[in-house]
Amino acid sequence: MASSLILASASPRRLALLARIGIKPELVLPADIDETPKKGELPLEYVRRMATEKAEWVASRHSECHILAADTVVAAGRRILPKAEDEKQATSYLKLLSGRRHRVLTAVAMQKDDAPTTVKVSSNIVTFKSLSPREIEDYVASGEWRGKAGGYAIQGYAESFIRFLAGSHSSVMGLPLYETRHLLMNAGWPISASSSFQEEYA
């Protein structure tokens, strides 16, 4: 087993989700990559590529470590909705998602030594209630959308917009724990309910 685990993400949500299964990375190191979707790239292709590139970017600088990376994207049909850049874009996202079903895809990647990067993808279906102009304006003003794929955060106020969810709540938050646990165990990391309990109540 490698000497340490690095989380290739700046997301505090992913760090908190790892703690739920008793995992505490030795280092948190966000990858510095271009996250612009390629022309014609489908949401599934994009999210797999992003998670892979994040893991490989960090691995190229810490080849002796295990690298865990993840990427989340909201997709309305074939359209990729990355993080909103400003209030105008966040508003347009919410108008698009209002009253309709969309997908939330999270890819998680594990890179160790010189082995090929292993990637697993969790696909989830989310349906929003119909949002009034006032609700959209109020949510955008809250700032909760900042740094969130699709312009909303399921772990915050926006959860009250969700009429239906099929899939993994942790995946929509940014890290599917089922797939992550599988990757970590295959990489040789000891995971147990007791270690998770100790981490939570330490």
From Swiss-Prot:
Q: What is its EC number?
A: 3.6.1.9
Name the UniProt key words of this record, in alphabetical order: Cytoplasm, Hydrolase, Nucleotide metabolism
- Cofactors (names): a divalent metal cation
Q: Where is this site: Important for substrate specificity?
A: 13, 72, 155
The active site of this protein is located at 71
Q: Which InterPro entries match?
A: ITPase-like_fam, Maf-like
GO annotation, biological process: nucleotide metabolic process
GO cellular component terms, semicolon-separated:
cytoplasm
**Looking at the record's lineage, which domain of life comes first?**
Bacteria
Carries keyword DNA-binding? no
What molecular function does GO assign, one term? Answer: dTTP diphosphatase activity
Q: Subcellular localization, per the record?
A: Cytoplasm
Task: Please tell me which top-level EC class this enzyme sits in.
Answer: hydrolase
Catalytic activity reads: dTTP + H2O = dTMP + diphosphate + H(+); UTP + H2O = UMP + diphosphate + H(+)
Instruction: Name the family the entry cites.
Output: Belongs to the Maf family. YhdE subfamily.
Its function, per the record, reads:
Nucleoside triphosphate pyrophosphatase that hydrolyzes dTTP and UTP. May have a dual role in cell division arrest and in preventing the incorporation of modified nucleotides into cellular nucleic acids.
Q: Which PANTHER family match?
A: BIFUNCTIONAL DTTP/UTP PYROPHOSPHATASE/METHYLTRANSFERASE PROTEIN-RELATED, BIFUNCTIONAL DTTP_UTP PYROPHOSPHATASE_METHYLTRANSFERASE PROTEIN-RELATED
Q: What is this protein called?
A: dTTP/UTP pyrophosphatase
Taxonomy, top ranks, is: Bacteria, Pseudomonadati, Pseudomonadota, Alphaproteobacteria, Sphingomonadales
